[in-house]
């Protein structure tokens, strides 16, 4: 693996006139993505100085003074990167498909936080002979998928506990990410149609990619080396 710990400047990039941070800002979300991104960052010489899971802070310094980390909701990561509030970020492919992140560069499949985006419904229950109701937080993905199947559906936006919807008649099916399927089975549901495979992707702001490439390049190279060494 290429050693990149000393590839970046050791003095923090700060515009002293207005305290503007001129280094790299990385957007991450708590949970599985954060946990599985940490080894990649450590290999690139970037380590958080505090545990985000044990803190209420939202901005974290790292062992590299020219890299800081923002902790966001997963669904907000593409927005922060797209608008330049973060230079780069890690987001699930499911979030990118739902967001329609057309104005960021999707540079790497990090092959972490892997799962599947699927439809699911009550086990062995036939679907009604009418326009289906689909409960999901992936409204755009659901509409696009069923349209590709030639089906018109009513999509009901939910923010969590999708598994409940078919059990109480709110939706005929759900669209959600499925890992082991244990949560579905525990609630009497079964996975049905496979929509797409999901993994976390490294996304970069288009302007930052050009203007800060010298800072980004060693981190990108390290990520690539880490991915190649485990594939």
UniProtKB/Swiss-Prot annotation:
GO terms for molecular function: ATP binding; ATP phosphoribosyltransferase activity. One of its GO terms (cellular component) is cytoplasm. It catalyses: 1-(5-phospho-beta-D-ribosyl)-ATP + diphosphate = 5-phospho-alpha-D-ribose 1-diphosphate + ATP. Keywords: Amino-acid biosynthesis, ATP-binding, Cytoplasm, Glycosyltransferase, Histidine biosynthesis, Nucleotide-binding, Transferase. Pathway: Amino-acid biosynthesis; L-histidine biosynthesis; L-histidine from 5-phospho-alpha-D-ribose 1-diphosphate: step 1/9. InterPro entries: ATP_PRibTrfase_cat, ATP_PRibTrfase_CS, ATP_PRibTrfase_HisG, ATP_PRibTrfase_HisG_short. Its EC number is 2.4.2.17. Belongs to the ATP phosphoribosyltransferase family. Short subfamily. Catalyzes the condensation of ATP and 5-phosphoribose 1-diphosphate to form N'-(5'-phosphoribosyl)-ATP (PR-ATP). Has a crucial role in the pathway because the rate of histidine biosynthesis seems to be controlled primarily by regulation of HisG enzymatic activity. Lacks the C-terminal regulatory region which is replaced by HisZ. This is ATP phosphoribosyltransferase.
